[in-house]
Curated annotation (Swiss-Prot):
UniProt-listed Pfam families: Acetyltransf_1 (PF00583)
GO biological process assignments: UDP-N-acetylglucosamine biosynthetic process
Residues binding acetyl-CoA, per UniProt: V86, V87, V88, L94, H95, G96, I97, G98, K99, Y129, C130, K131
Keyword Lipid biosynthesis (UniProt): no
Binding residue positions for substrate: T25, K72, F73, I74, H75, E84, D85, V86, Y115, K116, D120, E138
Protein name listed in UniProt: Probable glucosamine 6-phosphate N-acetyltransferase
Domain of life (superkingdom): Viruses
Catalytic activity: D-glucosamine 6-phosphate + acetyl-CoA = N-acetyl-D-glucosamine 6-phosphate + CoA + H(+)
Organism of provenance: Acanthamoeba polyphaga mimivirus
Pathway stated in the Swiss-Prot or TrEMBL entry: Nucleotide-sugar biosynthesis; UDP-N-acetyl-alpha-D-glucosamine biosynthesis; N-acetyl-alpha-D-glucosamine 1-phosphate from alpha-D-glucosamine 6-phosphate (route I): step 1/2
Enzyme class: transferase
Domain N-acetyltransferase: 3-148
Keyword Nucleotide-binding annotated: no
Amino acid sequence: MQISINELNFDDDSYQYMELLKQLTYIDPSIITNEMFEKQLSIIKNNPFHKIIVAKIDGKIVGSTTVLIEPKFIHNLSSVGHIEDVVVDQNYRLHGIGKLLIVKAIDICRQERCYKIILDCSDKVCGFYCKLGFTPKEKQMALYLNGK
């Protein structure tokens, strides 16, 4: 099984990508047109501190994560990396795809001189992230502005 890890691009299947995201959280691909998707992807790709990484097998998107870089004044003008929206298609889990995505995200954060990386996860996947060097820290807080 050949797995490729790359940034999400305009020639990737937008519907396939959104269907994958449905396994992570709420999204309704039926209301997002190709034009809307491309506009949003253009906004993301024009931001050098925002990267969507996808894993593909035979051209099919089977995993994804988002990396955000937050430039800081503290720690001698370094940055903080944020890993978000980690998802692997349920039919492809336990094949090392999640690990490949996180390793790529960590590499991006290193290249951007991040002094730490933050990610939020549920208790059931803490062990996975601990094996990759992450440690539980503090508590996460959230305020949902749209009620979801």
